Amino acid sequence: MKTITTTLLSLSLALSSLAQTPQASSPAPPSLDAVAGIYTTKPGAFISLAIFDPGDGENHLLFTDLTSGTIRVLAPGPGDIFAAGPALFVPSPIEMQLSFQRNGTKEATSLAIRKDKAAEETARRVACDRREITFKNGDVSLAGTLTMPADGKRHPGVVMLHGSGPLNRYSFGPFPDFFVSRGFAVLVYDKRGTGKSKGNLDASTLKDLVADGKAAVEFLSASENIEPGKIGLCGTSQGGFLAAAVAAENPSVAFIVNLYGMYVPVWQQELYRTEAELRAEQASDSEIAEALAFVTKEFEVGKTGAGWESLNATIQQSKEKKWWSHVTKSDSLDELRHYWDTLYSVDPSLPLQKVTCPVLALFGELDTSTPVADTIKNMREALSVAHNSNFTSHTFPKAGHGLLEVNSGASNEIPKSKRLAPELWETMDSWLQKTKSREQN
């Protein structure tokens, strides 16, 4: 994602030429907090403008149509203008402009959307109750945001669970807004050691992250704004399999939505990821075989503790290989053994054997991180141990990890993606409605 900042700068420069007056005399762009939120063009039709951290060290405004799946990172221009190009991170030519109407406190109340060869469309901002919150897991204080419809009613809740890496409350894209638009109260929080949360992410294990998720559920359960016994989990990637571990230890969890999370042993997932990424980037069979041999050897050393000297020699000889950036690696035997014990040896499907709530799992057929067929098979078998047949899975064609439309799944296609998988929002909405109906009957 190194090109994100450059492309956004290009879009901002292009926008400056659209100003009716010189940019220096234009009002400052609105803060992201003042314009971010959910907008509606007509009953049942919603647009998410989410504050989004794509990993480049800055927050951006992300436009998502919660019907069609159209998704764009927006760049600020002069005054109240934001705009986007023809694809997610492709800034030019400009194809969409957004301008805001604001109240006396500078909060956006509505927006006007202008697209090429289309009539201007107006969207009203949906009133939401957004609160900064903190909760604790032991000595670790975690900070986040709780958002719900501003109607004074109690709402079912959703706790969002992160994928791997130093992610924060702004890492989920449009998914929190989707749930809020459907009447849920949504808790997002900064992963320990990121944002405003305390703790040390590098020193944490999956067990720590599961405990953080449990603490989030307990915090939400104690809120007077939440319907008792109606808190679900939505996890992305690694968060998708952490959701099972959280629910296994908290039978009150009402449902799980697994967004492209893997349910195979982590070592197996890493082998799949290595091969799938290299094939998507058209590496040769010999390069793929060499990479898989390295990862297999690495895991054997991590498991047994024997053979580090030989592995380290291979590491030193392989740093210029084409496949090097696609494989896991450790700096010492102690580090490798730690990761084997706390990560690579973990089988996420085991906690699922204790889960009795409804489960929805959504994947892209071109996912280069999650082995989709094996994951679905393992999820179904694990849930059967708990006599849980309330399992629904769906695999979207031409979608990758993250459910963006792609051609091969290669990471360099992400900036050029134009939308999330068609029928994603309809699939989620339909399943949530059916789950709610079952609870009422």
Question: What does each of the following model-derived ranges do?
Answer:
Residues 399-402, 408-441:
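Catalytic active-site module of serine/aspartate enzymes centered on a nucleophile-bearing elbow/loop
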Residues 204-224:
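Alpha/beta-hydrolase active-site loop
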Residues 355, 361-363:
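Short beta-strand/loop motif that positions the catalytic acidic residue
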Residues 257-354:
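Accessory cap/linker subdomain of secreted extracellular hydrolases
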Residues 165-177, 191:
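The serine-hydrolase catalytic nucleophile loop
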Residues 179-196:
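Conserved alpha/beta-hydrolase
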Residues 20-136, 150:
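Peripheral terminal and inter-domain segments
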Residues 154-163:
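Short beta-strand element of the alpha/beta-hydrolase
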